[in-house]
C-alpha cells in the first residue's frame, strides 16, 4: 500500500494540479475528496494545456482510475460540460468514477450564492458564486440531494419539490428575487444524471480495494489549508476541509491508510478574494510577480493578490495537515528580483508571533517580520537538480525548508511538467 495526499499550504492556486499531474504518472488511482468546480487547475499534457475544475488531474492517463469522492459537491451541468470538453479533445473518461454519496449543486444553490454575496456588500467573502457554500449548507442541514438521488427520478422529484418550497420562500421573501419552478430543473438535471450514470458507484469500495491490493493512490486536494473551514482564515474560507484530514471523511478511507502528505507552495504567496494577507505587495514588485507568474484565477479570471513567502502560514499548514514533504513551485518567477524577503514571524502590538493567529482582527494588525536574502539573475528554467541552481536560489530553497520545518521533496522552475524536479520520492516506504 502506498498513499499520498497533495494539499495546498496557502490560499489555493499553489500549483497542486500540476504537481498532482506529475505525481499521477507513478500513481494508479487519483482521487479528489472535497470542494467542487470552484477549484480550477491548469495542466499541460503532451504539449496541450487543459483547464479542469471537477475532474481529477489523472484523467489523461487511460490506465489510471480517477475518483470524484463523496466529500465533493458536484454541479451536474458543469460536470457534463467538462466531460464534453475532454471528449472534444479526444481524452477518454472511461476511467472516471463518481461517488453515489456526493452531494449535488442545483440552480437554486447558484442563485442563493450570488444574492447572498451581493447582500453582504462590503462584507462579502469573495465566493466564486458556484453554489458551493449553499450546497454544503444543505448537506449539513440534512436536506441535500445526493448523486444517488439524482439517478432515481421519483426520489429526485420528491426531494426537489420539498427543497424548492423552502428555497423559493427564502429567495422571494428575504432577497426579493425570483424563485424556481420544478419544471425549470427536474427534466434537465435528471438528464444530466443519466449522462453521468455510467461513472457512478461506491467510490469508498474502489479506493479501499485499491489500497488493500497494494496499489498507489494519490489524493488530490482543492483550494488550500488557509481556506479550510476549520483551520483557515475564517470566514474568508471555503465550505469544506482541504486539510489532509479531509481525505478520510471525503473519500471514505480510514486515517491509518494515509502515509505521506505533500504540501504544495509557491515560492511566494498569492490569494484570490477578500481577507487579511500580511505579506501582500501593492507595489511594482507585486505587479512584476503577478505578470511574470500569470497570476490570474483559473476559475474566476480575477487578478490574484501577491505577496512574499510567508513561513508562518506554511508552518501552520504543516502542523494541521501533518505535511511530510514540501513541493515548492514557481521559483523561476522570482528571477531578477534583487532582494527577496521571507516572512519569519508577525509583530502584533509589540509582541512577536511565530504561529498563525485565529483572530482576523489581530491578523489585520499584524506586521510581517522579514528576513532578507539576495536574489539571482540567472535563467533557472532548465534546472534539473538542486546543483543546477545558482547559489542564491539554492539558499532560498534551503531557508524556506528550514523555516517551515518541511523537507524539500519537489521543486519547480516553470509551468511545464518537464520543469518539475524530484529531490526525494514521495512514494517512499514509511
UniProtKB/Swiss-Prot annotation:
Binding locations of Mg(2+): 13, 40
Residue positions binding substrate: 298-304
Cofactor or coenzyme needed: Mg(2+)
Protein name as annotated: Adenylosuccinate synthetase
Stored HAMAP family: Adenylosucc_synth
Gene3D superfamilies: Adenylosuccinate Synthetase, subunit A, domain 1 (3.40.440.10), Adenylosuccinate Synthetase, subunit A, domain 2 (1.10.300.10), Adenylosuccinate Synthetase, subunit A, domain 3 (3.90.170.10)
MF terms (GO), sorted A to Z: adenylosuccinate synthase activity; GTP binding; magnesium ion binding
Domain of life: Bacteria
Active-site residue list: 13, 41
Enzyme class: ligase
Residues binding GTP: 12-18, 40-42, 304, 330-332, 412-414
Subunit structure of this chain's protein: Homodimer.
SUPFAM superfamilies assigned to the protein according to its UniProt record, in alphabetical order: P-loop containing nucleoside triphosphate hydrolases
